[in-house]
Amino acid sequence: MGKQMAAKYDHLAVEKDRYQTWIEKGYFTAGDMSKTPYCVVIPPPNVTGKLHLGHAWDTTIQDILCRYKRMRGYDVLWLPGMDHAGIATQAKVDARLKEEGISRYDIGREKFLERAWDWKEEYASTIRQQWGKLGLSLDYTRERFTLDDGLSKAVRKVFVDLYNKGLIYQGERIINWDPEAKTALSNIEVEHKEIKGHMFYFKYKIVENGRELVIATTRPETMFADQAIFVHPDDDRYKDIVGMHAINPANGEALPIMADDYIDMSFGTAVMKCTPAHDPNDFALAQKYHLDMPICMNPDGTMNEMCGKYAGMDRFECRDALVKDFEAAGVVDHIEEHMHQVGHSQRTGVIVEPYLSKQWFVKMKPLAEEVLANQKIEDQKIHFVPERFEKTFTQWLENIEDWCISRQLWWGHRIPAWTNKETGEIYVGMEDPKDPENWQQDEDVLDTWFSSGLWAFSTLGWPEKTADLERYFPTDTLVTGYDIIFFWVARMAFQTRFAMHDRPFKDVLIHGLVRDNQGRKMSKSLGNGIDPMDVIQEKGADALRFFLTTNSTPGQDLRYDETKIDSSWNFINKIWNAARYVQMQVGDERPTLDTKTLSSADKWILSRRNEVLENVTKNMDRYELAMVGNELYSFVWDDFCSWYIELSKATLFSEDPKVVASTKAVLYTVLIDILKFLSPFMPFVTEEIYLDLPHDKESLNVETWPEHIDFEVTQDEIEEMQMVMSAIEAVREIKSTYNIKPGKDIAVSLRTDQNDFIALSDDAQAILTKMCHAQNEAELHSDDLLSRNIEHAVLTCAMNDLVDYKEEQTKLLKEIDRLNKEIQRASGMLKNPGFVNKAPAQKVQQEKDKLAKYQEQLALTQKQLSDVEQKL
């Protein structure tokens, strides 16, 4: 046996140093060729900082699946790794340089990359420590990084192959442009915020007839790049001016007036200016009508030489100056305040500019079509859990646009394309040009999602034909949030299909976002973020893990709730105390279960244990972790602790040594299986308890999943135990209601619905007597009877001389008076607008909860009073 368990559960003591031992023992290293492989690749966290609560949730789900599969006999590879996170990391390193009073341009590209690698090593170490604190069963011998040599080779090969097949090209498109970072952004790097702006209505004079058109815009600074004015062809107000020209008040140029059914006749004045280089919709119109696409803004967000006297101004400074000049010139018709969604750079915080730029693109339609075709083939499709997210996935692929993959950064995979300095020829290849002095490599790097899109196979050694790639690809399960289905899951799907002609994973388990207790997304701006390491310090990793995975179903958001984490901690404490009790009974010797000497209570708890095994296994295989957790909570708290342990306190004092031995064996067997069931959820405390009990293996990490226990039991035996337990609850409730001392003997009679007496077995009668001092009798000699419907029977109690009904009436009337006053007080507060509108929402809800509780108690007390008064 291990050491004597501590009197109190201490999560800090239990979790200290345990993880390092597991890693040193190699419990999580994959490679047992005798077993069926199961592979999960971790969604690589960015090396930009510490893990947040969403990471803790995502990785805990994966860890539970991997630990479960190991116990089921699989060779599990859970592959860890991290993402270089292009713009995010570069922004962090830039900020650190700024603190030193320098910029990346001062030190140059090579030195900057050295600093970025230093950053990566610093934060990779932090992330590994956090993984350890969470207890994640990762195979660190296979850890990867999106910029390591192997992955860089994979990235280069996919780029070259796509290019050679005509699926990568250079072209001009409207992209998200960050004027501060001076780079293109992916959609996920743009946060849309509702801000108060203005809608400006300006007058444009028609050249041919002098009529004035009023046109609205939110971005006057882009007017210098206007190329046309559009109206709807069916709009009678403007049919006669199509083909004419109107003067652009910003620069005096005559703009052609054109017609297109894209224009919404019900919006504003139904006249739209077209600025092709600064708006994606205008860009599409310009392509359709072959309009020029001049750019009026520099990459840093200042106005260029097109803008005359406004050249050199910041874009927003230009806006203000231009509007002021328009007002002086009488060009402004009117200005309205306008709430609208505006994209901001996630990294620098500046407003993103839709911007025409020459970039590298992936031609998406052929790649998407191949994925969509394979989604119709059962053994090739990606299965989504929940299924509804497959529609989200396929709809996006069906409407996909070409993907801008170039970024104007230094940190990342540099694009393997060179331009010949003399001829302008483009070379793209796996090897650098043999005469590098004659070639200029593209300065840009690839979008971070390009490399992370290869994660499912590049991490296993591709493009080399490695043993791991052969054994573990395609991977089995990806766990990720619904917010990156487009950005990551879809990209993994089409890049893997292109490179490997296969799916990246068989299943995708989708979870939601972690929100605060008010349902708000956690963010720095709201200051409502929670550091999982703080929670672990205060409550332990096991409590956090159990909370995260048992309070949300697949695809749903999770609300962070400290009271539920407390509940998880209390549950673990309950297990700890139960284990201490079992340890004290069992001692050093591992008891052997003899299924031929089982009591009624033994058979009942083992039957429940078998039911739980079946349900838990089924739901684990379905990814229904919350259902598993809730079932285990109920089984441990209610069945094992509240019932079987209490029942055992009677049988352990039996004079029959076989009964005592059987009770000890069942206590031990069920507890060990509880530890196995819960070990994927709470690995630290289950390991601690396991090692403190007599045990078969050196660690719970190498234990096997419980199996069905065969023993002889009839349905009648199970129903008798259920009936007796229900009878005990009913007798206790009656004694409590009528203030009868718990130790007072009471005569009861158990009968069927047809009023036939139900005789109990000796086991069952002994339990009834021990647990509630009740004796089951065929005849009750009493004129004061009280009945309750219980499970499988009707229970009748002989109440003679046990209750002073007059005294009970007085007590109940007093309680009813108290409850009425509380209800009146709470109702008054909730009818007070000053309280409801000004008090914190949590306080108002507490008062509502109190009112509901008082009303429920009042109804119950009034029913008790009615019962008592019938006896008077």
Regions found by a protein language model. Give the residues of each.
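Feature 926 captures the class I aminoacyl-tRNA synthetase adenylation module centered on the KMSKS loop
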Residues: Y201, Q395-F450, L454, F498-A541, ...
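N-terminal, positively charged nucleic-acid-binding surface of large information/translation enzymes
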Residues: G2-D234, M258, T275-K288, D292-M306, ...
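Catalytic cores of large soluble enzymes that bind and process phosphate-bearing ligands
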Residues: A6, D10, V14, L53-W57, ...
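Secondary-structure transition/capping motifs at alpha-helix termini
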Residues: R67-D75, R96-R109, Q129, K133-L138, ...
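Active-site-adjacent bridging/hinge elements
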Residues: S34-I42, I64, E100-S103, R128-G135, ...
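Short Cys/His-rich metal-coordination motifs, predominantly Zn2+-binding knuckles/fingers
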Residues: A181, N251, T348, N420-T423, ...
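Short acidic-hydrophobic surface loop/beta-edge motif
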Residues: F200-I206, M244-P249, G343-R347, W418, ...
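Structured ligand/cofactor/substrate-binding pocket environments in proteins
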Residues: G54-C66, G73, M82-D83, L151-A154, ...
